[in-house]
Every structure is written in structure tokens, then in C-alpha cells.
Regions:
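Sequence-pattern detector for short linear motifs
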Residues: 119, 165, 180-182, 190, ...
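Hydrophobic, low-acid, alpha-helix-prone terminal segments
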Residues: 173-176, 180, 184-195
Length: 201
């Protein structure tokens, strides 16, 4: 069952932006049927496996199955900006945040867990490949149905789905440690020019 706030039960005409927000919100809550209910994170440090996936899939579904085909543009101007702003604060944290007790969870229902995590998932789609990404997600859901999962479980199913590509998602620093889900602040690229005028990243 999904409940909805009164603010989304419109009694008069609303702006297209507000109607789109309702669609994304309803789809976000429906996504929790899979990401949160069907498969639940093992511990709160992986809260993003619920919230980032719900944010990502709700935006994807809005863009591909509703009249709001520019939902990713809306995401970039709203949610992604929210994440970038929060990532500049002294209170920022990694997407996979250290959670020592339940009191630590309260600060993680924020732009990092929702929007930055969803942005990382969108990057993973391009990194793994769309078809292989969704094959991996399907396997992740089926392998952990009605049970718990971790980031390592997710990466293992994505790694299996992307074979025979070289390398390992589990060990690439772009994803763990100082990378996308383990780092704070947004990533910066440094460009250096050598004596021959070649640019290096």
C-alpha cells in the first residue's frame, strides 16, 4: 500500500512542474516495493540502496513512461543541485555512510543519500551499459528477494552481468573508498599541461 500526502491530491489546477513532482514522488514510493521491501539493506550504512534506487528509478520511469520526457533535466536542476549544495557543507558524508547506531541514521535522509546516490546510479548505467545494468539489477533483486543486501551484493551482480568486460567493480577505486560512494564532496578533475603542451587529467 502506498499513501500520499494531501498536498498531492489536487483540488484545482496546478503547474506542470508540481504535477511532475507528484508523479516522481508516487513512483519513488512505488519503487520502494522493490528497493526497500522486496530487498532491504542489511544495515543503515546502505540506506542508499533503498533511497537512491527509488530516486533513480522514479526519475527514469517518469522520463520514459509519462508525458514528462525531460524528467532528467528536472532532476539535474533540482535534486542534483540539492546534492551538490549539501556536499559542500561541513555536515556532508559519503553515500555509504558509517552508521554506528540508529541515531546516526537521521542525518542521512538527505540530498547525499537520495540525489547524489541516484546520480551515481545513473553513472553506473553508462559505465556498465544499460542492458547489462538492468540485467544485474534484476539478478540483484531475485538473488536477495525477501532478504537483505549490501553494496558488495549489488556490485557482485553488476559485475557478473557486465562480463566479459575486464576489471572488477568490487575493487575499482571509482566506486569504493575514496571513489563515488565512499567519498565526500563532489569530484574534481585536475588538468595539467606538460612541457610539450599535452593535457593530462
Amino acid at each position: 500500500m502506498v499513501t500520499i500526502r494531501d498536498q498531492y491530491v489536487f483540488e484545482s489546477k496546478v503547474t506542470d512542474a508540481y504535477a511532475e513532482r507528484r508523479v516522481v514522488t508516487v513512483l519513488h514510493e512505488l519503487a520502494h516495493m522493490w528497493f526497500g521491501d522486496y530487498v532491504t539493506m542489511t544495515w543503515w550504512n546502505d540506506l542508499w540502496l533503498n533511497e537512491s534506487f527509488a530516486e533513480f528509478t522514479s526519475t527514469l520511469a517518469t522520463a520514459e513512461a509519462t508525458e514528462w520526457k525531460d524528467a532528467w533535466a528536472t532532476f539535474s536542476s533540482g535534486e542534483k543541485s540539492w546534492a551538490l549544495n549539501q556536499d559542500q557543507l561541513s555536515t556532508t558524508h559519503p553515500i555509504v555512510a558509517p552508521i554506528n547506531d540508529l541515531n546516526d541514521t537521521y542525518v542521512n535522509f538527505d540530498g547525499i543519500t537520495y540525489a547524489k546516490g541516484a546520480s551515481v546510479l545513473k553513472q553506473l548505467v553508462y559505465y556498465v551499459g544499460r542492458e547489462k545494468f538492468f540485467t544485474g539489477i534484476n539478478n540483484y533483486l531475485n538473488n536477495h528477494a525477501y532478504s537483505n543486501a549490501t553494496l558488495a551484493d549489488l556490485l557482485a551482480t553488476l559485475e557478473e552481468a557486465r562480463q566479459p568486460l575486464p576489471g572488477s567493480l568490487l575493487h575499482e577505486h571509482e566506486l569504493l573508498g575514496d571513489g563515488l560512494v565512499g567519498a565526500v564532496f563532489h569530484r574534481l578533475l585536475q588538468l595539467l599541461e606538460d612541457v610539450d603542451g599535452h593535457i593530462h587529467v
